[in-house]
Structures are given as C-alpha cells and as structure tokens.
Amino acid sequence: MKTKYFIPIIFLLLFTRCSTNSDTDLKNFPEGYTPEEVGTRISKRFISGKHMLHKKNGKDGIHYAEVCTWYGALKYAVAADDTALIKQLQNKFDPLFTTEADYQPRMIHVDLNMFGCLPLEFYQITKDKRYYDMGIPYADTQWQVPDTATTEEKDWARKGFSWQTRLWIDDMFMITIIQSQAYKATGKREYIDRAAREMVMYLDELQHPNGLFYHAPDVPYYWGRGNGWMAAGMTELLRYLPKDNQDRPRILEGYRLMMKNLKDYQLPDGMWSQLVDDPSCWAETSGTAMFTYAMITGVKQGWLDKKEYSPVARKAWMALIPYINEEGDVTEVCIGTNKKNDKQYYYDRRRIVGDYHGQAPILWCCFALIE
C-alpha cells in the first residue's frame, strides 16, 4: 500500500525543488528573455540611434540619459566579451574628439558632469589616454568651485561636499557614477571617498523610514524613477567602494532598507508603479529596471539574501521584457519629470517609447546578470 504513494511523492518533491530553483535562478531564462538576447538587441538599437541633446541647439551636449545608455551598452559588451560591439560603440564615440566636439557637455552642472564616466570607461578598456584626458576633468571640476558659484553652492563646498549638490535624489547617481569611474581609472581614493561622504549626507537628509525618497523635500511623493536613481547610485557606489571605507556600513544600511521595502511594494506581476507606494498608479518601466538592477547586483555581490531577493529580481526581469517592442524600444517610460506637489501630475505624465531613460537600465540589468 505504501509503494503506490512513494513515486508520486518523489515527483512532487522534485517538482517543488525545481520550481523553487527556477524562482531563484538568475542565470537561466527562457528564449527571448536571456540577457544576451536583450542586451544585444538594445545595444544595436542604440548604435543606430541619434544623439539625445540637453538643448535643441546642442549647447549643453550629450544628454545624461544617452550617456547612461552608452555606458550600459559598453558594460554589457565587455561582460559579454563582444569585441565587435565594443568597437561599434567606440566608433560612435570617437567623433566627440573631432567633428562632434561641441557635443561634449560643459562642466557646470551635476547632470552634465556625469558625462565623464563614459570616456573613463573607454579608457579602462583601451588604455588610450585621450579618453582619460577627456573624462577626468569632469570628476575634478565637480569639487572645484567656479567663480560663478552661488552662495549656496560655495556653502556646500565649504562643508566638503560638491558645489553641485542640490539634494535632488537623482544627484546620487550622477555624482557617484563619475567619481567611482575616476577612482577606478586612477586608483585615487579621494574620488570615491568623497562620493561616499556625499551619499551618507543624502541618506541622512532624504531617506524615509520606509526606505524610499520623496521626489524632492517639498514634494511628498515617491516617484519611481527618482527612487530608481537613488537605488542605482547606491549600487554603483557599493560595487567599487573599498571595504575599509568608514561610510560603507551606513550606505549598505540605507541600500538594504530600500531593497527591503521595495520588495514589499512590488506589484503582483513583478513591476513597480510610477508612484512606488501606490499600486493603483500605472506600472513604469524605467524605475522598475533600476530597482531590478539594484537587486540583481545585491544578490550577486552578497549584499542581499539570495533566497529572499532572487525571486523578486527574477520576477521583475521577466515582467520587463514584454515591454520591449519589436524595434528594441522600451515602452511605458515616464517622460522627463520635474518635481511638482500634485499627485495627479505624476499619474498624468506622458508615457513614451524608446527613450534612453528606459533603454539604459535594461542594459544595466543585462550586464549585471552576465557578469
């Protein structure tokens, strides 16, 4: 009598085990969902695309969202060992030394200075000093106070922070990405140490007990992509911040608090909302992809418990891919959004297709998955 139950029980146990492994698996994905397929599609789409400029006349040069996408494609190409793709990305960049030199952003604003992360990444790959010479001034001038600085900007500098400090949450990606790259390119601790100190100040000033961040201190809404910049910024900083940095424990604490609460705010289908804590708001792709990148990296780096967070990251990745259309464009991307103390404003933001704000973090997920 016992024998007839034995085989079904074995199959049940095996099925349960396979299902559990599948839920936590960040290596094996079905066809169409692999990071190699997705990364190649979106990278090729980027190579064929036009520049996104800060102003219509190009006065302030390449837009930070394009830089983020370029950086993501380059990191993906390196992780995938795709030398042909690296060369294509380099060929797209090199006119910035010559015919497109006017597109190099001025070193006057946090959103512009982050451009330097891209030539510094090329420098680390090629060892061509042209890229170093282009990139490193963007890191240096973030702490070199210009004569035109306002009183508030000078006050930040006197406290040891960047004169470009605004206490806007997206700053914590823009500052950390360029300072981290400068540290990697030079080996000089001052770059990443000062970025870490800045991050701690932002965490102390802006993070709420639920781990999230208002779009701005006077705008009490947890906007998805705004929080995504913070999640990605902490992730990027922790990737390279030396273990003996005195601020690392505080940053890791803030990161884990955010990830813990994001796990609870994830929608049943795996996405996150345009307003993170409002499940009735529409699912937005750029913020979701940034959160996914932060969690994938946290699991793989050992900052997060694998059993607890791998299913969250995998579910999010699987939910994101259907939002990529046949052309390789990410859909349901919130348009660029300035702060406004009006909840309906965030509900009504236009949703766009193929914007670099959405393309970039998908590529970050791709390289994080295959590194």
PLM regions and their residue ranges:
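Aromatic-lined, polymer-binding surfaces characteristic
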Residues: 60-73, 108-123, 167-172, 176-179, ...
